[in-house]
């Protein structure tokens, strides 16, 4: 209690409260199960009814052909009904001019609980939300208590929110790694490995030119130079400590891992951005709400690109270091909040792709001799909904990871390297409260000394440089891949349009 003080009480109370609250109100359920709609295909009976209505509209001179076709449908239907005992699914072709309407129904919790990875999404979003609340309360506590105690020094406490943020970060990385493992089972996994290897080489290049163009300060912090003169003592030769090379290799491996887990989330984000631009282009009615959302989504995509420029030395060379760190954290948090606020719009754009898939099916049927069956129709529509757990996790988890890295950067950037052991005496009533909570703070002062020794060996500057570099890579690689995805989808759509026009 002497190390964590009142923080552990706040943490336990908040988590107990949130555990009880999630039964009635969940931030994850609110994000996904309120205000969103998804398409659902007709049943087999509705398909048959639509086919009958289609043939009933034909002329009388084709009545014989109609009866033969209807008999064939009834025949296949009876055969498949007889085979239902052997667990075979009923399948029949659908004519191209059959009038079929997709059902647009709201997304409910009862529907999404059968979706894969949706339980992980709900539990992880709620846990990370609790960790964020604990971090904010802890920061308020550590800011207010020195004012109450009439002491400007830091408290004799270790920030407990670091522990909860670390657990949240670890769980998010586990889920994204699980997605990569699923991709590796198919051909798409090769892209993750390829871009991971390219990012490893790119990270090596960036870390060796950081002093000229980038504000990483890796060489200044970890690169101990040794000056050796040649035989004539007229020329100096600088050698960098070997430990710096090990750190460079370790950071490059971390960057490669970041790229691997962020490739498909960033690529999908760029794809959703393209779908939104395409939808807005074809939108006939444009009111104030649509224009406002369009501006927000454009800002959401462009603002992170300008945030990456805060690590370029030619731009920030005249800015104070403390203000620069605050500006980096503030700008990234604005990007994160904007992306969370636009969560429903992006997910709704994804759910609307079920309607586009049906249009593509009919276009393929017109160009080729393949025929649409009821199973292929249903499969193309329902696959969008059943992949919702992966899409939502890929959208929200990189945002939370970046937010947690910002929290760590804030804690280690604006904090003294040593924790004070002897501080000024607070007021009597507050001192009695402290004695009751901590049972005298001197009992565990040896642990605080150990914490201070660790800080002298590996101080806040070392940690801040690492966190700033990891944050830069996470933010920049996500922007680069999403921009590449937007360009790729635009090019593919243009090529398909040219091909259809030529045909």
What is each of the regions a protein language model found here?
Residues 1-44, 97-183, 187, 191-503:
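Alpha-helical transmembrane segments of secretory-pathway, organelle, and plasma-membrane proteins
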Residues 68-88:
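Short, non-transmembrane cytosolic segments of multipass membrane proteins
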Residues 26-75:
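Membrane-interface amphipathic/juxtamembrane segments adjacent to transmembrane helices
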Residues 88-98:
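Charge-dense, helix-prone N-terminal extensions
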